C-alpha cells in the first residue's frame, strides 16, 4: 500500500508531537529577544536566577504562549509539516538531509 503524498490526514503522533515541535521551534525563533534576555539573566545570576529572572521568564512565557495559543500560527506550522511530509513521501529523503550541502571535493 503506497502512501499518497498529497494526503492531508494527520496521525496522532503528528498532531500531538511533530507539529507542536515545529510550533516550539518557530516560536523560539520569533521570541528570540526574550530568549536572549532570559538566557543572559540566568547566566549572570547563577543560583539566584529563580528569584532574579522572574521578569524575563514572564516575558518569555507570555511571548511563547501567545504563539502556542494562536490558531493561525498552528495552521501555518501544520501546513509546513504537511509540505515536508509530502516532499518526503515523493523523494524518500528527509528535509534535514536535503538541506545539507554536498561536499565540494567530489
Curated annotation (Swiss-Prot):
Domain CHCH: from-to ranges: 28-71
Record localization: Mitochondrion
Keyword match Acetylation: yes
Family: Belongs to the CMC family.
GO (cellular component) term, any one: mitochondrion
Superkingdom: Eukaryota
Predominant location: mitochondrion
Residue interval(s) of motif Cx9C motif 2: 53-63
List of residues that carry N-acetylalanine: 2
Record protein name field: COX assembly mitochondrial protein homolog
Motif Cx9C motif 1 per record, residues: 31-41
Described function: Component of the MITRAC (mitochondrial translation regulation assembly intermediate of cytochrome c oxidase complex) complex, that regulates cytochrome c oxidase assembly.
Keyword Nucleotide-binding among record annotations: no
Keyword annotations of the record: Acetylation, Copper, Disulfide bond, Metal-binding, Mitochondrion
GO molecular function term, any single one: metal ion binding
Subunit structure: Component of the MITRAC (mitochondrial translation regulation assembly intermediate of cytochrome c oxidase complex) complex, the core components of this complex being COA3/MITRAC12 and COX14.
Disulphide connectivity of cysteines: 31-63, 41-53
Organism per entry: Mus musculus
Pfam families: Cmc1 (PF08583)
UniProt xrefs under InterPro entries: Cyt_c_biogenesis_Cmc1-like
Amino acid at each position: 500500500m503506497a502512501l499518497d503524498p498529497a494526503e492531508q490526514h494527520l496521525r496522532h503522533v503528528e498532531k500531538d508531537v511533530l507539529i507542536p515541535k515545529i510550533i516550539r521551534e518557530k516560536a523560539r525563533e520569533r521570541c528570540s529577544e526574550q530568549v536572549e534576555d532570559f538566557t543572559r539573566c540566568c547566566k549572570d545570576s547563577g543560583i539566584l536566577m529563580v528569584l532574579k529572572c522572574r521578569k524575563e521568564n514572564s516575558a518569555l512565557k507570555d511571548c511563547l504562549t501567545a504563539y502556542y495559543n494562536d490558531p493561525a500560527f498552528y495552521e501555518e506550522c501544520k501546513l509546513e509539516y504537511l509540505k515536508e511530509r509530502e516532499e518526503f513521501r515523493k523523494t524518500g529523503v528527509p528535509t534535514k538531509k536535503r538541506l545539507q550541502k554536498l561536499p565540494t571535493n567530489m
